[in-house]
Each structure stands twice: as C-alpha cells, then as structure tokens.
Swiss-Prot record:
Keyword Transcription regulation: yes
Any one GO cellular component localisation term in the record: Swr1 complex
Family annotation (InterPro entries): DAMP1_SANT-like, SANT/Myb, Swc4/Dmap1
Low complexity bias (residue ranges): 363-383
Keywords carried by this UniProt record: Activator, Chromatin regulator, DNA damage, DNA repair, Nucleus, Transcription, Transcription regulation
Basic and acidic residues bias: start-end ranges: 1-10, 486-507
Primary role: Component of the SWR1 complex which mediates the ATP-dependent exchange of histone H2A for the H2A variant HZT1 leading to transcriptional regulation of selected genes by chromatin remodeling. Component of the NuA4 histone acetyltransferase complex which is involved in transcriptional activation of selected genes principally by acetylation of nucleosomal histone H4 and H2A. The NuA4 complex is also involved in DNA repair.
Protein name from the UniProt record: SWR1-complex protein 4
Gene that produces this protein: swc4
GO BP, sorted A to Z: chromatin remodeling; DNA repair; negative regulation of transcription by RNA polymerase II
Pfam families: SANT_DAMP1_like (PF16282)
Length: 586
C-alpha cells in the first residue's frame, strides 16, 4: 500500500511532512602552521599535541582624552582623564599635519563642554532650612552649646554630607573673645571644649528634628518624615557610646574567647532544641512527686486479699487523675452547646473568702456580685440539664467511658486478648484454671455485661495464680528450712551421745571374763622384781580401755527395755572411777 492511499484512508492532506535534509559533511578547517599533506595523514584522529598557538590578550592602550570641567566646582578647573583607546580602524592617513592638529583641538573643546562622567556621584543631601535668630532663641537655645558653635557644626555637616567620622576629625571650634565695655579690662577668651562624636550627633539631631517640626507639624507629616523625626528625637548619646564600646570589645576578642563563645552558643542551641523534652520530663517528675507517700506496712500485701486491695486502690487513683484532667480548673466538666454545667451548692473558694474578709468595700461588693452571677448560672444550668438515675442509665444504655481507643473494636477480640498472657506457660495455666471452672475461652455471647464479668473473672484468676505461685515458693522454702533443721538436730544428738559417760550393768560384768588376781608378792621381792608389777598394771589398763570401748559401742537403750535398775558392786564402781580418771589423763 502506498503512502498516498494511507493518507486518503485517514483523511490526511496529500502533502506529508517535508523530507529530512541530507546531512552535510562538515569539513574541518585545516589549522594554521601545518601543511595539507600532513593534515591528511592524521585522518579523523586528533593530533597528540595541540598545534594551536596561544594568543594572550594584549594590554589595553590608554590615551588622554579632551579636557573636562567638573560641574560641582565653581571655578574654571579643567581636568584630563586617561581613557582606553578605541579599536583601530583603517582611516586614511592625513598628509597635512596642521589639519590633524586643528581637528584635535576642536575635539578637546567639544569634550570639555560636554557633561562630566563622574557628576552622577556628586549627590547633595537635602538639609532643613536654617533657623533664624528668633527660632533659635525660642526653640534651640542650650546651656551647653552656643549660637556660634551650633552654626559651626551645621556648616561642617553641610560641607561633609553627614560623614560623622570626617566631621569629628575636622571639628576645631575656636571660641571668640568676649570684649567688655570698660577700658581698663582686657579681652577674655573662653576655654576650648572637647566635643565627642555622640555630642555632635545629639546636637545636630535635636536641631534638625526641631526645624522639621516647625516646618511640618507632626499631624501633617508623612510616614517617612514622622519616622525620621521620632528617630532623631529619641537619639541617646550614652546608649550610642555604650554600643560602640561593646562593638570594640567584640572586635578585640582573642581566639580563645571566640572559641569559648562558639561552644556556649552551640550549647544554648542544644538546650533550646531539647527544651520541649525537658518540659515533658519535668511535668512527669512533678506528677510522680504528687503521689502520696505510703505509711502502711508491706506485710499487708503478702496475701491475695491485700494484693487485690492494692490493685483496686491504684485503679481508683488512676481514674481520679484522669477525671481531674478532664474537668476544668473549678472542677467543672466542659459541656457542648455553650451550656453552663451543673454544680452543687459548694462553699466559695479560699480566695473568695479572703477577699470577703478584707475591709475594702469595693472589693467585697464585686466579689458578692460575682458570687450572685455564678449562683444564677448554676441554677439556670441545673434547670436546663437533667441528671439520669442509675436505673435510667441502665435502661437507656448510657455509659461513661474513662478512655476510648481509636478505631472499631469487637468485644470478642477484647475478651480473647484477656486470655493471652505474656508467657506461654502463664497462658496454659490460665486456660487450665478456666477449664476447671468450666468457663470457655471464647465467649458465645460477648455482651457488655458479659465482657465486664469476664474481665473480673480473668483478673481474679490471675490473682489466684500469682498467690499460688507465691505459696509454692514459700512452701519450698519451708521444706528446705525443715530439712536443714533436722540435719542440725541429728548432728547435735550424735555429739551428745559421744560426750555422754558410759556405765556397765551387772549382766555386762558377768559376761566379761575377770582375769585371775596376781599372787601376793613380798615387799622384798617387789623391790627386787619391780618390772613384773608394772607389767601387770599395764595389762589392767589395757583391759580397762578395751572394756570402755565395748561399753561405748553398745546401745544405751538396753536399760530402758529392761526397765529394772541393777545393783552395782564395789569392784564395778572402782573400775568406773579408774577408767574416768584415765580418760581425763589421756
């Protein structure tokens, strides 16, 4: 299909867009200083080294122009200025030098008559009209400034165009001599007085403001003139001097002082940025300090009843705080529609009572009027608003919420969240407790009353679980202490049994074989045979110690089982006494 057919089908004009132009080949200009053959050898690649010759800007050529006469001067002063020479043009040379000199002189005379180029910077300030003698005597007289010195100051100000630095530097007033009429007296020269820049400014501003007010009264002044008049009249020399001293101190600071000031400014910015956070923390701290100090004993909260009482007390305190934040400063809740809320007939505040006791009659009357107006408003509001009884609130479904969460919530979700504790173990304990009470975890009909009762039940179950946990902990501690006590008693009993003296019965004496008594030995024989006697005594001691050990190992409960007190022979008693004395020696 041809393009013309397509245009015909689409109802387009026959002539389409113009055809694009053919790209013309750009022929690069051969740089100067290189031959055509060498440039052709380079091809499309750029030369590795630039061949262009650097051409620096030449110095401007200056020439003197024709003379000019400044318009700001009254004399015939002629000045010459250096100006740049215009670009050279191909002007044919003039053969006659005289004609060239004449043309130059004519150009100089023409330029001397034309306007001076720097005349635009010659700006003269507009000063107020000079005062007359009558105006000076009535409005401008001063004890510190004379008429001649004031005239001298005004002349300097006009001459140097309010450049106060130059004026203060050139100020040199010479007071005139005072001539007396008497011939004998000589002329008196008053002392020269030094004037500061602030004093000169104050005097000039006072004269200028007074003359401006005489020419144009303040009621007829424009906004700019009135602003200027106010600034000149309110000029304070002492404040200006103090400002300059502070500026000098600021400029003469050392590097350490500048660094310290920078640190202080950064700290100030940080404190200002965190001011809101500080205010919030301070308010929270004050709210914590308002909590009353508990004087009760902590032992009251060791059982479940004390813990439940503590929880109810904290909830009640939290509700009272929220209620105080909702109510106004006078304890009145804000109402919509501009109606005044109802307040019972309460006594006046302490401030009203203190004002009523003052002897000032006007204050008492105003206080009484305020009280009467407040009472009238209360009565009107009480008539306009009707308070519902609890039965009516239950009938109409009126509810007072302490806090409402944003968004839509289902009661079933709220009841389900109550059964979920922080830990999985606590959740299982709560579920088992509800299973024992035969209460389902998910309510079938979660009405408002059912959800409230379910919340109370969950709260009681949590208290029960906490109390059970505490009880188990206490019982385990009791068992540990009892076991430790039994161990101590057992050890003490063993120690007592070891330290208890041991006594033999007659039956035990009969059971133990008595060794045969040694033969009597004469005194002479004993002296001759002293060694066998000592041997017999050692054997007796060994027998006695072995007997004692046997008695100690025997149980003392044999005498209690028999229940009969056996008689003891003299030999047994003597043996016991010998054993006890030997034990002490050991």
């Amino acid at each position: 299909m041809a393009a013309a057919d397509v245009r015909d089908m689409l109802d387009l004009p026959a002539e389409g867009q113009p055809r694009p132009h053919k790209k013309q080949k750009v022929v690069e200009k051969r740089p100067e200083g290189i031959t055509r053959e060498l440039f052709a050898l380079l091809g499309e690649r750029a030369p590795p080294i630039a061949i262009n010759e650097n051409r620096y800007k030449g110095r401007p050529k200056w020439q003197t122009k024709a003379r000019v006469r400044p318009c700001a001067r009254s004399d015939d002063l002629v000045l010459r200025h250096w100006q740049r020479e215009p670009e050279s043009t191909n002007i044919p040379a003039i053969e006659d030098t005289r004609a060239e000199g004449e043309t130059k002189e004519q150009g100089e005379h023409k330029t001397a008559d034309r306007e001076y180029p720097f005349a635009k910077y010659n700006i003269k300030l507009k000063f107020s009209n000079r005062y007359t003698t009558d105006e000076y005597n009535r409005h401008l007289r001063s004890e510190d400034w004379s008429r001649e010195e004031t005239d001298y100051l005004m002349d300097l100000v006009e001459e140097y165009d309010l450049r106060w630095v130059v004026i203060a530097d050139r100020y040199d007033f010479q007071p005139q001599r005072v001539d007396n009429t008497e011939e004998t007296s000589s002329a008196l020269v008053p002392s020269k007085q030094f004037r500061t820049m602030e004093q000169m400014k104050a005097r000039y501003y006072f004269v200028a403001a007074s003359m401006l007010a005489l020419e144009h009264p303040p009621s007829e002044m424009s906004e700019a003139e009135f602003d200027l008049h106010e600034r000149m009249m309110k000029f304070d020399p002492e404040r200006e001097r103090h400002r300059k001293e502070l500026a000098a101190l600021q400029l003469n600071r050392t590097a350490d002082e500048v660094r310290e000031e920078t640190v202080l400014l950064e700290e100030l910015k940080r404190i200002t940025a965190n001011e809101q956070e500080f205010v919030t923390e301070r308010r929270e701290l004050y709210s914590r300090l308002d909590v009353p100090i508990s004087v009760s004993n902590a032992t009251n909260y060791h059982n479940s009843q004390g813990l439940s009482h503590l929880l109810q007390t904290l909830l009640q305190a939290d509700k009272s705080k929220k209620r105080r934040s909702i109510l106004g400063p006078d304890g009145i809740a804000p109402t919509s529609g501009g109606q005044t809320p109802t307040i019972p007939n309460a006594p006046g505040s302490a401030r009203d009572s203190s004002r009523a006791d003052t002897p000032n009659g006007g204050t008492t009357q105003s206080t009484t009027t305020k009280k009467a107006a407040a009472a009238a408003n209360r009565e009107a509001a009480q008539q306009a608003i009707r308070t519902l009884t609890p039965a009516e609130e239950a009938r109409y479904g009126v509810q007072h919420h302490d806090r409402l969460a944003p968004g839509v919530q289902f009661r079933s979700d709220r009841a389900q969240k109550l059964t979920q504790a922080k830990s999985h173990v606590q959740t299982q304990k709560l579920a088992s407790a509800l299973a024992e009470l035969e209460v389902p975890l998910r309510l079938f009909m979660p009405t408002e009353r059912v959800v409230k009762e379910f919340e109370k039940l969950i709260h009681s179950v949590n208290l029960l679980l906490d109390a059970r946990k505490v009880a188990e902990k206490v019982e385990s501690e009791i068992r540990v202490l009892e076991a430790a006590k039994e161990e101590r008693e057992r050890k003490a009993k063993e120690l007592r049994e070891k330290d208890k003296p041991e006594v033999k019965s007659e039956q035990q004496d009969n059971d133990v074989p008595i060794p045969p008594a040694p033969a009597p030995v004469a005194a002479g024989d004993a002296s001759q045979t002293g060694q066998p006697a000592k041997t017999n005594e050692g054997q007796a001691e060994l027998n006695g110690s072995s007997t004692t050990n046997n008695v100690a190992d025997s149980e003392p409960s044999t005498q209690e089982q028999e229940g009969v007190s056996h008689k003891r022979s003299a030999s047994v008693l003597s043996n016991g006494s010998d054993k006890s004395s030997k034990r002490q020696k050991k």
